[in-house]
C-alpha cells in the first residue's frame, strides 16, 4: 500500500518502537493530549514537545493539515504506521489518529533521540524540490 500524501518522510522500523515507548512513558509520567483536534491546538499554542501522526488514517484529510502546521510552527512531528497501535500506546482501547506530548516526563531522553533521528532523516532528503538540480543552465 502506498504512503498517504501527507506523510512527508519515511520513518525507519527501528524508530517506531521508541516512538510508541516515549508515548507510554509520557502518558504515565508527563502530559499527553489525544486526538487530532487536541494535537492541532497544542501545535498552534506552541506547547507540544512531539506530535505523533498515524499513517493509516481514513480519510487522510483528518490529519493532512498536521504536518503543514507543524512546519509553520517549527514543531517536531513523526509518523507511526498504525492508529490502532497509537491508541494502545496511549493506554486507550480505541484507535487514535494523532497525539501530542506536552510534558515528556521521564520520556525526555527517548524523545530527544527520536527528534534527533528525525532531524537527520529530514536533512538527508531535500524537501519541496520538484526538479533535479542538474537542470540548471548556468
Regions found by a protein language model. Name each.
Residues 35, 51, 70:
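Residue-level signature of catalytic and energy-coupling elements of molecular machines
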Residues 4-10, 54, 78-84:
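Short, functional N-terminal and low-complexity linear motifs
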Residues 1-47, 105-138:
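Polybasic, low-complexity intrinsically disordered tails and interdomain linkers
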Residues 21, 30, 55, 60, ...:
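Flexible, active-site-adjacent loop/turn segments at secondary-structure boundaries
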Amino acid at each position: 500500500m502506498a504512503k498517504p500524501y501527507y506523510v512527508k518522510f519515511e520513518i525507519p522500523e527501528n524508530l517506531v518502537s521508541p516512538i510508541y515507548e516515549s508515548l507510554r512513558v509520557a502518558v504515565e509520567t508527563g502530559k499527553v493530549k489525544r486526538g487530532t483536534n487536541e494535537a492541532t491546538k497544542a501545535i498552534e499554542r506552541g506547547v507540544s514537545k512531539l506530535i505523533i501522526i498515524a499513517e493509516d488514517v481514513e480519510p487522510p484529510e483528518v490529519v493532512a493539515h498536521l504536518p503543514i502546521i507543524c512546519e509553520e510552527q517549527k514543531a517536531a512531528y513523526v509518523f507511526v504506521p498504525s492508529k490502532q497501535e497509537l491508541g494502545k500506546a496511549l493506554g486507550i482501547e480505541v484507535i487514535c489518529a494523532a497525539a501530542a506530548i506536552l510534558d515528556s516526563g521521564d520520556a525526555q531522553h527517548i524523545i530527544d533521540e527520536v527528534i534527533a533521528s528525525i532531524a537527520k532523516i529530514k536533512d538527508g532528503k531535500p524537501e519541496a524540490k520538484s526538479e533535479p538540480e542538474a537542470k540548471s543552465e548556468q
